[in-house]
Regions:
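The feature marks helicase ATPase cores and/or their adjacent C-terminal helical subdomains
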Residues: 1-591
Length: 591
């Protein structure tokens, strides 16, 4: 794509004078156009600010990078950050501080808080219930979402028992939710609930309206299709205060239904914006075959045309038929080599992490089952590997940090179960940033190569015992012995077998949203998820033209590819996928 000149429709987005929605296909240069608009609008506003919001830190970092030397646009009164950070800083913090006379402590997820898990009486061998399985109304009432209950929660009888006791579970979840709010521990979910509550409360509206009206002249929303009920309520409130709303997105890339993001709500909101809608329909990323594959998955009517250098690449989509997951990587590498790509150019994508890991030959470490020694060993492998993505590295560091923090808090007095990670660090006297550095250093320093599980466990305990803890109280040898025991042989064998790392990088589809790669290997596993309501799989949805999130996930995955798209399809589904591609005119070859 030309690095200097915007297309006509991109320029229209930059120059729009009313609140509006711009629909952008994959690779349409939306970030480039949004940053151009952001720079233009910040230069025009003398007193009020312009906010540019997205939904991931990676997307925000990319916006900041593209602002280049224009660093003043990243300073007050302007704002570039995630929508969650916007909610925290400009809505929840001022309101919570006023109501509770203390500052809130934000945590990313409920599972970062020990007391966010709970049990009902007579649950037997079932796992703990988690607040993440519930939706919360603005008044704090919980609603159990059956589809969020993991399959390994318990057998059919256990699941049936939970559903029979649904009201009791919801009441308990509401109680814990309220206790956490009172304690000042606010997850992203809780912050969105509180924001919605205060925006519909007369007193809250009276406080927030002048604050937001005087601060922001315009809010630009990237990946607008990911807006849920709460985000749309906030945008409506801002619009009512006279703030201009610019939304850019692709409703076919809406894959966050677990946080109440639904394309229909976004379309309805966008349809009521006064400005003329704009379509960015030129794909500057992918080949014609990949664009055709994308169109076969798209539910909306936005056209998509290959442009730029890759528009001249006539490589077809490649289908791999496999019976066993270990057949995928060798076949993909052969195809890549034939197309002048290397393993470093590829990424293996799957909807569920376990399917991608299995195809890549990686044994997962389940944070709910594995002991701390296994987590630390596995984290070291992840951090030393050249093929792990940032999300996997972040997850690995989190596992180690929480393991270390457990050692520092085990001897503390009761009453810490409602505290989040940062609050726990403050209680025991360690800086969270120091703890992160310590966790990385420990995981990388301790190598499993040639060591038994007992030897490695002893090295972990020694590392912690001899560490310099500064103002924090060092953990006792007894505590270290109880917390850091060697895993059993089968777990250790699984950890050690992954020490060399996978041949191809892998990730979930959600982990690469907004990114692009020369080659993508998309895995359709043998056991496809069956929707609890429709009883259909993603292949059923694709064949039948049903508009579902599972289908949109495949669309997001395929549209990351620039030059080569490989679909690894289990033998059970290969003929059905071929029929779909034939019917939709997708150029492909089967190997």
């Amino acid at each position: 794509m030309n690095d200097l000149r915007l297309t006509e429709n991109q320029q229209a987005l930059v120059d729009a004078e009313e609140s509006m929605f711009a629909a952008a296909c994959p690779g349409a240069g939306k970030t480039r156009a949004m940053v151009a608009r952001f720079l233009k609008r910040t230069a025009e506003e003398e007193r009020r600010g312009v906010a540019l919001l997205s939904f991931t830190n990676a997307a925000v970092d990319e916006v900041r990078r593209r602002c280049g030397e224009h660093t003043r646009v990243l300073e007050v009164p302007h704002f570039v950050g995630t929508f969650d950070t916007f909610i925290h800083r400009f809505i929840v913090t001022p309101m919570y501080t006023t109501a509770y006379r203390k500052k809130p402590n934000y945590v990313q997820r409920w599972r970062d808080v020990p007391s966010a898990n709970f049990r009902l009486s007579r649950m037997g061998q079932a796992k703990d219930l988690q607040l993440d399985w519930f939706d919360f109304a603005p008044d704090g009432r919980a609603r159990l979402i059956e589809s969020r209950i993991p399959r390994d929660f318990g057998n059919d009888a256990v699941r049936a028992d939970l559903l029979e006791r649904k009201r009791a579970a919801e009441e308990y979840a509401s109680h814990i939710f309220g206790r956490l709010i009172d304690a000042g521990t606010i997850s992203c979910v809780a912050a969105r609930c509180l924001a919605e509550y205060w925006l519909q409360d007369a007193q809250g509206e009276q406080i927030l309206a002048p604050l937001l009206r005087s601060r922001f002249a315009e809010v630009i929303v990237d990946e607008a299709q990911d807006c849920g009920r709460e985000e749309l309520r906030i945008l409506q409130f801002l619009k009512q205060q006279g703030t201009r709303i610019i939304m850019v997105g692709d409703t076919d890339q809406s894959i966050y239904e677990f946080r109440s993001a639904t394309p229909d709500r976004v379309r309805m909101f966008a349809d009521n914006l006064p400005g003329r809608p704009i379509e960015l329909k030129d794909n500057w990323r992918s080949t014609p075959a990949i664009c055709a594959f994308n169109r076969s998955l798209r539910c909306g009517q936005l056209p998509e045309t290959a442009r730029g250098d890759n528009s001249l690449n006539l490589t077809p989509v490649h289908l791999i038929e496999y019976r066993s997951p270990d057949q995928i990587v060798p076949a993909a590498l052969d195809i890549a080599e034939h197309n002048k790509l290397t393993a470093d150019d590829l990424i293996l994508l799957s909807h569920a992490e376990k399917h991608g890991m299995k195809a890549a030959g990686v044994h997962g470490v389940d944070s709910g089952k594995q002991n701390r020694i296994a987590r630390i060993a596995s984290a070291g492998h992840v951090l030393r590997s050249r093929t792990t993505d940032p999300r996997a590295r972040r997850k690995a560091v989190d596992h180690v940090q929480h393991s270390v923090l457990a050692a520092l808090t085990i001897d503390e007095k009761p009453g810490m179960e409602h505290l989040g990670f940062d609050a726990l660090c403050e209680r025991v006297g360690v800086d969270p940033r120091w703890l992160e550095t310590f966790a990385v250093r420990m995981a990388i320093s301790l190598d499993t190569h040639g060591k038994t599980r007992d030897v490695f466990a002893a090295e972990v305990r020694a590392f912690l015992r001899t560490a310099e803890w500064g103002n924090a109280k060092a953990p006792s040898s007894g505590s270290l012995g109880r917390l850091f025991r060697a895993p059993n042989e089968s777990v250790w064998d699984g950890v050690v077998s992954t020490s060399t790392g996978p041949a191809i990088a892998f990730s979930t589809v959600h982990g690469v949203k907004g990114k692009e790669y020369p080659g993508v290997v998309l895995v359709l596993p043998e056991r496809l998820r069956v929707d609890d309501v429709t009883t259909r799989t993603v292949v059923d949805d694709w064949e039948g033209g049903h508009h579902t999130e599972a289908r949109r996930v495949l669309y997001v995955a395929a549209s990351r590819a620039q030059q080569l798209l490989i679909c690894a399809i289990h033998k059970k589904y290969i003929s059905r996928i071929e029929a779909v591609l034939d019917n939709t005119g997708v150029p492909y070859t089967r190997v």
